Amino acid sequence: MITTATQDTTSKTITVVVSRGQSRNPEKRGLEQAVVELAGKVEGVDVIVIPHLYDLPKSSESFAKLKDIEGDLVVVSWIFSRAAHWVLDRNGICGKVGKTQWTDEDKADDDSGESVASEAPSIEVEPTEVVDRVTDLYPRPDRQVYCLDLKAQNDPKVFVSELRRIMGLKEPSSDTVHLPIVGGQVVQVEEKTGRRWYPVIDFDRCTNCMECIDFCLFGVYGVDHGENILVEQPDNCRKGCPACSRVCPENAIIFPQHKAPAIAGAEVDGDEGFKIDLSQLFGAPTGSDDPIATAARERDEQLLLAGRDAVGIDDQLKKRQSDLAAGPKDRLDNLIDSLEAFDI
């Protein structure tokens, strides 16, 4: 069901999508509503309020509504910005990643003081071989999709300030705040959803290597008519299992509801990734387990729960382990080596 609250209309410039969270926490609901109300007062903005992005099926009324929009989008949700972008992409709402001036980690930085990266030594990075990504071969439409994470800020005015920046609008002065409000329309889409768990592929990183389809034994992955990887049966995925994300060579597989930021879609490439607790970067247990061993164990747990036999680290995973061990060190390896060299 769709309900609409219409104000004085102007020519539409941009659509803001506010995705409600799964929680009924009154503070979170209050933040959502405040963003809706403030954004709805900006000239040239239409607002659509939908249920939680990740829980919506592909056939949902919400996604059908969003597919009809051709221009730029600003999407505000409770999952990491990167995760939100690729949830939309897999459901047919495609575009290029819009650049924002603040990140998912802004609030965490303000609360925690200096980051690990600020104290880390400079690291020489060896050039890596250029590899074609799926979006290099199949470019997305030439429009911008800006995704903002509600977890990053608790002041609705910050979101609206970023919206105005994206639109190229100046902040309202004290002389204009009392003028009549000229906004767009606010559309609320009401539909029932249930909590889901499935992988989301970041095609800006994916190289179509097929490691995930070879690893997953639950029929989650498939290929399209162009032999590109896709999440074919999302609801076949075992709830709580992120094992395939650990074996992905490009960190292209996202589980938006996972507790580990790197798996949930936080940006971890480059120095900004080192702000995350390195010992828990991929949510692995403390100890000597590598991501491949952890992935194999998680897969076996789900196989046993499904009444099937465990397979452990098979020949393909052993080869992957040996390739990783023989390969050049990455930025994380170099950082850890540098930290170990400190005289502390």
Language-model segments: residues:
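Poly-acidic low-complexity segments
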Residues: 49, 83, 149, 155, ...
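Ferredoxin-like iron-sulfur electron-transfer modules
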Residues: 186-211, 219-246, 255-264
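Iron-sulfur-associated redox domains of electron-transfer enzymes in respiratory
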Residues: 1-189, 194, 332-344
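Charge-rich, low-complexity amphipathic helices
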Residues: 61, 88, 95-96, 106-110, ...
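Flanking helices and flexible, charged tails adjoining ferredoxin-like Fe-S electron-transfer domains
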Residues: 2-4, 9-14, 234-344
